[in-house]
């Protein structure tokens, strides 16, 4: 994730590793699901709004994109090490703002990380055909 590309190399991110029991219990308030509580650790992927690059032609801010790229690097690295991850973004933003109070930083995703249980059901991922997503002009 540290080597992930970002717009104008701003690297507008911070990653908070949540490992202690107390911190996990606070995090669970923002996303209260049974399966989510089973992870041994979580990584909260934060965007630094004051460091994000903005495209001048349409004022599109690229912070979420940059954090997403770095976060996916993290998920791919975990997968390479036979660890499971899940992208969680349906969390309570008010609770997250209270847990991580900062004028500049905002949570983009929470990534639970852990070993995949042997009895975990494995479903085949449904992906669009390459012809549906790639166009040559």
Segments from the language model and where they lie:
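Small-aliphatic-rich amphipathic alpha-helix that forms the alpha element of a beta-alpha
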Residues: 1, 43, 58-99, 111
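A glycine-rich helix N-cap at a beta->alpha junction
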Residues: 35-42, 101-122
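Glycine/small-residue-rich phosphate/adenosyl-binding loop
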Residues: 3-70
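Short secondary-structure boundary segments
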Residues: 47, 90, 115
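C-terminal helix-cap and adjacent tail motif
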Residues: 51, 109-137
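Short secondary-structure junction motifs
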Residues: 10-13, 80-83, 108
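Histidine kinase transmitter module recognition
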Residues: 4-7, 77, 103
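Short Asp/Glu-rich motifs
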Residues: 20, 97-98, 104
């Amino acid at each position: 994730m540290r080597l992930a590309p970002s717009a104008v190399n701003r690297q507008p991110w911070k990653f908070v590793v949540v490992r202690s029991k107390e911190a996990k219990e606070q995090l669970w308030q923002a996303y209260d699901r049974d399966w989510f509580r089973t992870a041994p650790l979580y990584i909260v992927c934060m965007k630094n709004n004051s460091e994000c690059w903005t495209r001048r032609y349409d004022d599109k801010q690229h912070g979420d994109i940059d954090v997403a790229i770095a976060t996916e690097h993290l998920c791919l690295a975990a997968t390479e090490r036979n660890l499971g991850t899940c992208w969680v973004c349906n969390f309570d933003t008010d609770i997250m703002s209270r847990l991580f109070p900062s004028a500049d930083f905002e949570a983009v995703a929470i990534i639970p990380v852990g070993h995949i249980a042997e009895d975990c059901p494995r479903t085949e991922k449904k992906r669009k055909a390459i012809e549906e997503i790639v166009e040559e002009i």
